Amino acid sequence: QQTVYTYIQSRFYRSPEVLLGLPYSSAIDMWSLGCIAVELFLGLPIFPGTSEYNQVCRIVDMLGLPPQFMLEQGRQTNEFFNVHTDAYGRRTYRLKPLEQYSHEHHVQEQPSKQYFPGSTLPEIIRLVPLSRRSGRAADMEKEMANRTAFIDFVSGLLNINPYERWTPQQAKMHPFITGEPLTRPWQPTAARPATPPPSAASSHTVALQGAPMPAGPTYRDEYAPSVPVHG
């Protein structure tokens, strides 16, 4: 039997499923790898959270909300999100405002400091100044092509949904690793275990600014068989 710990991974590299208190697998290591790869490129952590709440906020601000099934099944979801259920039983999740979280936890959370221009991962990577040796047009074109491949690569590692996050076997075949040209967004040939069907709560909605998100799957035995959660 696997024991799932509530404190695992250094905060800057902690995966969404761990933050939300969900069962986890080796997919958490691929999230950490994505964080480290981007940090090596930027020179600073991509998600330098000052607390678990701030960590969740930074991830959501950059990558969007976790899938519905993660929010509905996460043991820690109510720590970070408010949930509203309408008359039709549809749920809407919103990040708790900084003031509310601070009041509930008797802490003084501070707004996130912004270290990079841009708000999305592609913007942040593309806006990093080019080096002096990239002054020639051909060098600049090559550098931007490398960045495009890098963005595609780390996007597969930093997929919030652990079912869709790339495995090591998938990631090592990416053109950024193999050196082949990237002509279109890359799709791995081998997938993780089949994604489970949508839950019965498929009519629920998840929102950051009021926009609904599609329903997601539920955890199943292939992902975390008979996992007791301690802590």
Task: Please provide the spans of the model-predicted regions.
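C-terminal lobe substrate-recognition/regulatory segment of protein kinase catalytic domains
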Residues: 66-153
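Activation segment
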Residues: 6, 21-26, 47
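Terminal C-lobe "cap" of eukaryotic-type protein kinase domains
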Residues: 144, 159-164, 170-184
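Conserved activation segment of eukaryotic-like protein kinases, specifically the C-terminal portion
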Residues: 3-18
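End-of-activation segment of Hanks-type protein kinase domains
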Residues: 17-22, 40
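Intrinsically disordered, low-complexity regulatory tails and linkers that flank structured modules
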Residues: 179-231
